[in-house]
């Protein structure tokens, strides 16, 4: 944007904002921050997923995210508007809900060729809901954007392509790329039918992760 465009945005923002915790109100953030951008042209959106959606709304997050994407494409009059989504980093508060949110983000990305997602599960901080090393998250998001929408030869984020239940004590995950871990295979969990997370051992060979 040029200087005149920024000045116009500031005037619109001051008109639209509500100083009484607008971000907590329905459509508050959109009306206060996004609405003033009406009429501008954008190639894509980088979406840093927040944590407010984990409080009971995580199971329907794919529907909410798809609705947001459709709404923004209509608002900016651009059906080809791309979305690059940074998944949530891990945090001690209700970690299962975080996993559900990230799973829903992956579902949306797989169902829309104009949506990609960057995985940040390993970037969590036990003492801070906001990851400290934003550079890593930004780099991953940029690499996924360049790879998916600009044809750049960047390494793909690790994703599970398929899985095989070998027995009631062994599961194999088949990844999209060979997996290399700096600090060994730790932090793996499985979710039981009753909804409980269980720690498990993991061994890695090429693109196959075996959980026991």
Question: Predicted segment positions?
Answer:
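Cell-envelope and extracellular/periplasmic
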Residues: 1-212
